[in-house]
């Protein structure tokens, strides 16, 4: 199973390249609530929200109860290492680590997280 980040889902929907098509066709793709929320946040209408919900229904939803202390410690360690990033990216990384799945993303923030937390596994896109 591979946890897909918001950016790769949007890229796949808007401009799928051969590599993304291969990944989405051959891997068990999962999303989490944060990714769902980010996708819905970007919608321009109720109709688009419904389309998003229908499109992501084919992915496995990773249900997650956040360990807030663990997340806080992750963010603290990242900040102490000079790394500042969006809160949502840290949460997505924590979910990937806790579920022991690779994260499919094109966002370089996750490489920074991985430099401090090598247990975060990134799916090779290129």
Map each language-model feature to its residues.
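Histidine- and aromatic-rich ligand-binding microenvironments
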Residues: 5-7, 31-32, 84-86, 107, ...
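Acidic, PIN/NYN-like endoribonuclease modules and their adjacent C-terminal/linker elements
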Residues: 100-126
């Amino acid at each position: 199973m591979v946890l897909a980040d918001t950016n790769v889902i949007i890229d796949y929907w808007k401009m799928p390249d051969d590599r993304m098509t291969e990944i989405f066709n051959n891997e068990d793709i999962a999303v989490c609530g944060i990714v769902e929320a980010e996708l819905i946040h970007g919608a321009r209408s109720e109709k688009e929200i419904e389309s998003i919900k229908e499109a992501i229904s084919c992915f496995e939803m990773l249900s997650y109860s956040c360990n807030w202390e663990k997340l806080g410690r992750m963010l603290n360690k990242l900040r102490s290492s000079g790394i500042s990033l969006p809160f949502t990216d840290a949460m997505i990384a924590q979910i990937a680590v806790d579920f022991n799945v690779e994260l499919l993303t094109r966002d370089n923030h996750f490489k920074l997280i991985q430099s401090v937390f090598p247990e975060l596994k990134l799916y090779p896109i290129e």
